[in-house]
Amino acid sequence: MDNFSYIVADDNTREAVVVDTGAYVDTIIAKALNNNLNIKYIISTHEHSDHTAGNKDLALATNAKIVAHRNSRIYKDIAVEDGNIIKIGEIEIRIIHTPGHSKDSICLLAENKLFTGDTLFVGECGRVDLPGGSVTELYDSLFKKILTLEEDVEILPGHNYGTKPYSTLNYERKHNYVLQRRTREEFAKFMSSN
């Protein structure tokens, strides 16, 4: 199970955001130093430890603020909600609350890149059988939020479960079997059978 951590940086100010630290603190710090980046925020797409294990250590090393959805049970300096904007330099990162995998799941839209955490993967979607999971909330998150975005949006998931590490919304809409048009009831039945 490969976890992905991402660094989003403004080229002019060198301010950066880390999306999902995972257990990669040393690697993240090295990349930030090598690229002369100032990590301003650590954003967790959800509270599961495989995405948040390094939050406190990275925050201590960089003085970055930890950001998570207000429903998240992890330590956070900044609580966010759907529609909030986190800004680094000229880059605006829009918070999209996407519950389903967990109550606190969020996706982050930065320009045409969507960091999906465990909400949507290449060719798959997040599990709903863990505490806080909800098939109806995942349906709404996928079909009423994510699928309303522009087709050229790049999907950058929290894990490498697919045939490739990233995709586009247009490709996923056409090829991801989870995203085939279904009613909420059909989706619930489909998810319970997989």
Model-identified regions with their sequence ranges:
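Short, compositionally biased "basic patch" segments
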Residues: M1-I7
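Active-site HxH/HxHxD metal-binding segment of metal-dependent hydrolases
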Residues: D2, T13-A16, T21-R94, K174-V178, ...
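Core dinuclear metal-dependent hydrolase active-site scaffold
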Residues: I7, I85-A110
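Residue-level signal for inorganic ion chemistry
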Residues: V8, D20, L58, D118, ...
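Histidine-centered catalytic micro-motifs
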Residues: I42-T52, I96-K103, I155-G162
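Metallo-beta-lactamase
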Residues: S102-N194
